Amino acid sequence: MYKRQVIGLAPAFGTKQVKTIIDLPHDKVLREIIAGIEEEGLKWRIIKVYHTSDVSFIAHVAAEYSGSGIGIGIQSKGTTVIHQKDLPNLSNLELFSQAPLIDLDTYRKIGKNAAKYAKGESPTPVPTRNDQMARPTYQALSALLHIKETELVDNNKKPQAVTVSFQ
């Protein structure tokens, strides 16, 4: 039997910030990731990571907390990483850096792929879109959201389990 898939949330996720950079509600993002995990037959749990706002480090912590060694990290603005605990912090299995281009279907696929990695499979990476105008269009807002996220970093606070329920 496979261990639970762990999703690591950034410090502001779902509390001080409740939507991604393109206004996708955080609860819908989580629902899709969880649905993808469950479609692969795995269970999940969520932790909030307080000591960093770097999505790669958040994902690595989630991977360390996961029995399978695979974790998902999500920043409040929507940037997401699938990580493996045996990889260096700044390496990863899949990186979704252009948050303005990540839709709910992509979040579901991220959950599915993370679960497949956890089961020892080698899935085809989730297709990502590229838009040359996304960076200049969202750069200022992205920086502002990251600053607000980073203000909530607490180097002395350990990751904590998060309970979620959906209406």
Language-model segment annotations:
Residues 33-41, 66, 114-122:
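Structural signal for hydrophobic packing residues in well-ordered secondary-structure cores
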Residues 30-63:
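Active-site rim loops that border cofactor/substrate pockets in soluble metabolic enzymes
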Residues 5-20, 45-47, 73:
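Short glycine-rich or small-residue beta-strand-to-loop segments that form or flank ligand, phosphate
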Residues 1-2:
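Short, small-residue-biased leader/transition segments that mark boundaries at the very start
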Residues 14-16, 21, 91-167:
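C-terminal binding/interaction regions
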Residues 61-79:
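Short, structured active-site "lid" loops
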Residues 78-98:
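Amphipathic beta-strand/beta-sheet edge segments enriched in Tyr/Trp
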Residues 24-28, 32, 53-57, 67, ...:
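Conserved active-site and cofactor/substrate-binding residues in soluble primary-metabolism enzymes
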